[in-house]
């Protein structure tokens, strides 16, 4: 049966296919070309199989499709995620803005705070103690009013992060049910996204998940719809930690380095075959550039900062910047002003 490996970048999509007889085929096409096709990955598969755009993919002849994608990465770098509402314990509304109070430039008087991903924050009247016992009962009516207002204002994604909810998730579960009844498209709860102590890391990661999961889910659904005729084709996505997961389990918090992580695994395997055990990887795409290091074993981090955003999730140790082959360097008068990814 056919097998496909696809790297969907911000500018180009690369496809490697193996025919049933073992022959390897490769193809490359633009990730965005609305006049020619809806999705580059599906278009590439059809092109390799000599199908027309309107033809259905014979999924009974395809064993698996394994993908890495920078959809979430580029959405974060370019701040194109979904509008998000943050619900947090009363008294902690500014917690994620304050963060850990890190100041890279200690004596700089003009402090540049990182851009927040959430549009709005609501402090919820509720409180648990460190053992998970209720100190203050949840005010459900307050939450219902806040959620209705956010929904009416066009916000469709909600992040819920309460104090000590990793011990007792009852309050978060109640809020999640209310948000579900209000038909929010994405509901991220901290005790599921990052069930660990420390509200800053848990809250940051939950917001990232709520911000990116909708755009990621739309893309995954777009691909899976073309491959679900008889459900015989296995669709899997590369996670930031370098492992593959089923398409239905692919989350925003695990997708930030989906594409780059696949590059690290490929670099290491290629390097080993060539007899090298120490490697530095430089991966420049059209939208972003990734740099990584290997000295005998994969380097991973659990808490990291990407594009000015803190996140607590296992991922490959990769440094990413929003500057690629298609980036635009602006020039005014006698100085270069800024470099940004193309739109």
Cite the ranges covered by each PLM segment.
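A short acidic Gly-Thr/Ser loop motif
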Residues: 7-10, 69-70, 89, 260, ...
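Glycine-rich phosphate-binding loops at beta-strand->alpha-helix junctions
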Residues: 161-171
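N-terminal glycine/serine-rich phosphate-binding loop of ATP-dependent small-molecule kinases
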Residues: 1-84, 129-131, 136-159, 172-190, ...
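Glycine/threonine-rich beta-strand-loop-alpha-helix active-site module
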Residues: 97-101, 105-106, 278-281, 288-332
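N-terminal, positively charged, Ser/Thr/Ala/Gly-biased leader segments
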Residues: 188-203
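Conserved small/polar residues in nucleotide/adenosyl-binding loops
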Residues: 337-343
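Active-site phosphate-binding/coordination module
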Residues: 83-133, 190-194
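Short beta-strand segments
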Residues: 68, 85-89, 123-125, 161, ...
């Amino acid at each position: 049966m056919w097998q496909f490996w696809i790297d969907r970048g911000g500018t180009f999509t690369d496809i490697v296919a193996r025919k049933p007889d073992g022959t390897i085929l490769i193809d490359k096409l633009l990730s965005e070309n609305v006049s020619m096709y809806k999705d580059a990955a599906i278009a590439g598969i059809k092109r390799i199989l000599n199908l027309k755009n309107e033809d259905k993919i014979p999924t009974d002849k395809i064993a698996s499709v394994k993908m890495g994608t920078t959809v979430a990465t580029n959405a974060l770098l370019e701040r194109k995620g979904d509008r998000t509402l943050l619900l947090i314990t009363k008294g902690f509304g500014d917690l994620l803005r304050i963060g850990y109070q890190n100041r890279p430039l200690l004596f700089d008087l003009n402090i540049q705070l990182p851009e927040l991903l959430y549009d709005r924050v609501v402090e919820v009247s509720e409180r648990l103690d460190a053992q998970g016992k209720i100190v203050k009962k949840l005010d459900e009516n307050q939450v219902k009013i806040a959620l209705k207002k956010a929904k009416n204002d066009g916000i469709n994604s909600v992040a819920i992060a309460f104090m000590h909810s990793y011990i007792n998730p009852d309050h978060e579960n109640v809020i999640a049910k209310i948000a579900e009844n209000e038909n929010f498209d994405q509901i991220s709860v901290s005790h599921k996204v990052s069930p660990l102590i420390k509200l800053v890391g848990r809250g940051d990661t939950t917001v990232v998940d709520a911000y990116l999961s909708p755009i990621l889910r739309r893309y995954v659904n777009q691909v899976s719809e073309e491959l679900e005729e008889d459900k015989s084709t296995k669709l899997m996505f590369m996670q930031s930690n370098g492992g593959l997961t089923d398409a239905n389990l692919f989350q925003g918090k695990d997708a930030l380095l989906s594409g780059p992580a696949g590059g690290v695994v490929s670099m290491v395997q290629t390097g080993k075959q060539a007899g090298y055990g120490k490697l530095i990887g430089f991966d420049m795409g059209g939208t972003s550039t990734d740099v990584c290091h290997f000295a005998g074993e994969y380097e991973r981090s659990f808490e990291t900062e990407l594009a000015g955003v803190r996140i607590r999730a296992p991922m490959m140790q990769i440094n990413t910047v929003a500057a690629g082959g298609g980036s635009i360097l602006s020039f005014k008068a006698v100085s270069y002003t800024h470099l940004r990814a193309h739109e």
